[in-house]
Amino acid sequence: MLKFITIIIFTMVLSACSNMANLTLYQQLDGKAGLERLVDSFINQIGNDEQIIHYFEHANISHFREGFINHLCVLTDGPCEYTRDSMVEIHTGMHITEADFNHVVDLLINAMNEQNIDHTVQNKILAKMAPLRSQIIKI
């Protein structure tokens, strides 16, 4: 009987892992509601950071919020279409340094940790964002 129960539990664990692997990042983040929570945490991180806040002095925060939620939705294979300005258009003239870029990544990681996002999911999100780095630094 114990062997049977062990097999059932093992099968359930494997099934749960398999189902998680089939979910998109968007689904693993709890869809739009999860993205909203993440972006709100990220905005809070930025707002409390003296090194980065100057980049947002003249920003429309609600516009940034909606745009970043939409951007993440597309990036995580959600049901969205990104129709806003490109990353080059958004960041041109901001003269973002490599140190500040890396610091913003740290703030995003802090926000993901605050939202208890699994580290595997965090790494997948960061890997999808990494190609944007060259489009953002010092343009």
Give the residues covered by each predicted segment.
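C-terminal motif of bacterial Sec signal peptides marking the signal peptidase cleavage site
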Residues: 15-16
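Acidic/polar, glycine-anchored loop/turn motif associated with catalytic or activation segments
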Residues: 19
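Glycine-centered helix-coil hinge/cap
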Residues: 30-31
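Heme-based O2/NO sensor domains and their adjacent alpha-helical segments
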Residues: 22-26, 36-113, 117-119, 125-128, ...
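Bacterial N-terminal signal peptides that target proteins for export
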Residues: 1-6
